Curated annotation (Swiss-Prot):
Cross-referenced Gene3D superfamilies: 3.30.70.240, Ribosome maturation protein SBDS, N-terminal domain (3.30.1250.10), SBDS protein C-terminal domain, subdomain 1 (1.10.10.900)
Official protein name in the record: Ribosome maturation protein SDO1 homolog
Family annotation (Pfam families): SBDS_C, SBDS_domain_II, SBDS_N
Family named by the database record: Belongs to the SDO1/SBDS family.
GO BP annotations, alphabetical order: cytosolic ribosome assembly
SUPFAM superfamilies for this protein: EF-G C-terminal domain-like, FYSH domain, Hypothetical protein AF0491, middle domain
Length: 240
C-alpha cells in the first residue's frame, strides 16, 4: 500500500522505542511501517510524516541530536526511524490492524492456492475452500510477518481438515516459430526455465518448473498466445 507522497500528519501513527531510559517517537504511515517490520523495502520519504525524532510527539518535543548520536550512533533520521520501527512498537488502531490482517490473509490464501494441490484430485484447492478451512481452524495471521513466512506453518495446520501438499511440476513445452518470441518472455513469468532449445525451424522447446497450482493458468496463457498451437507434457512432479 505505497503512496506517491509522504503520509499526512492526520493519517500518521506513532512508532515508539525506549532505550537507556529514554523514549523516542516518530510519526509514520502505519501500512508502510508494517511492511518494513515484515522485512520489505519501503520508501522512507513516504513512510515518515515528518523527518523528526521526538521525545514526545504529542507535545512536539524533539530529541536532541546529541542524545540521538549517543543512543543510535547517528543523527540520520531515516536510519533512526528504521531502528525505532524494527525494535519498537507501532501504535496501530484496531481498524488499521484489521485492514493489514485481511490484506495479509488474502496474500497467504493466494500463495497456498498457487503452490499446493489436493492430492486426491491432483488439482488446486480454490481460494474460498482454503479460506473456509482457515476460519474453521481459527488460524491466526501475524501482521508483522510476511505472508511467505507464514504459509508453511499454516499449510501444516490445514492438513488437519484438507488433503493438501506443496507440489511443483516440470513441464516440457514446444512452441511454433511464429509464436516463439512472444511466448518466450511469458514463460519466465510463470516459473523457472531449466532448459531451452531453439530448433532450426525457429520453434522453441523449453523445460520449465512451475507451482502445480497454476498449471491450468499456465496452459490457458500459452494457448492464448499461440492460438492453441502449443504442445505441453508434464515430465516430473515434486511433492513436499
Amino acid at each position: 500500500m505505497g503512496r506517491d507522497i509522504m503520509v499526512s500528519l492526520e493519517e500518521a501513527v506513532i512508532a515508539r522505542y525506549t532505550s537507556h531510559g529514554e523514549k523516542f517517537e516518530i510519526l509514520v504511515d502505519p501500512y508502510l511501517a508494517a511492511k518494513l517490520k515484515e522485512g520489505q523495502n519501503v520508501d522512507f520519504d513516504e513512510l515518515l510524516a515528518i523527518e523528526v525524532v521526538f521525545r514526545d510527539a504529542s507535545k512536539g518535543e524533539k530529541a536532541p541530536e546529541e542524545l540521538l548520536s549517543k543512543i543510535f550512533g547517528t543523527t540520520d533520521v531515516k536510519e533512526i526511524a528504521k531502528k525505532i520501527i524494527l525494535k519498537g512498537q507501532v501504535q496501530l488502531t484496531a481498524k488499521q490492524r484489521e485492514e493489514i490482517r485481511e490484506q495479509k490473509k488474502r496474500q497467504i490464501i493466494t500463495i497456498i492456492s498457487r503452490n499446493t494441490i489436493n492430492p486426491q484430485t491432483d488439482t488446486p484447492h480454490p481460494p474460498h475452500r482454503i479460506e473456509k478451512a482457515m476460519e474453521e481452524l481459527r488460524i491466526n495471521i501475524d501482521i508483522y510477518k510476511s505472508a511467505e513466512e507464514q504459509v508453511p506453518e499454516i499449510v501444516k495446520k490445514l492438513k488437519k481438515v484438507l488433503p493438501i501438499r506443496f507440489e511443483k511440476r516440470d513441464i516440457a513445452v514446444k512452441i511454433p516459430a511464429e509464436f516463439a518470441s512472444k511466448a518466450y518472455n511469458a514463460l519466465y513469468q510463470f516459473g523457472a526455465v531449466k532448459q531451452e532449445e531453439w530448433q532450426p525451424d525457429g520453434s522453441l522447446i523449453v523445460l520449465i518448473e512451475i507451482p502445480s497450482g497454476i498449471e491450468a493458468e499456465f496452459y490457458a496463457h500459452l494457448n492464448k498466445i499461440t492460438k492453441g498451437n502449443v504442445q505441453t507434457k508434464v515430465v516430473k512432479k515434486y511433492s513436499e
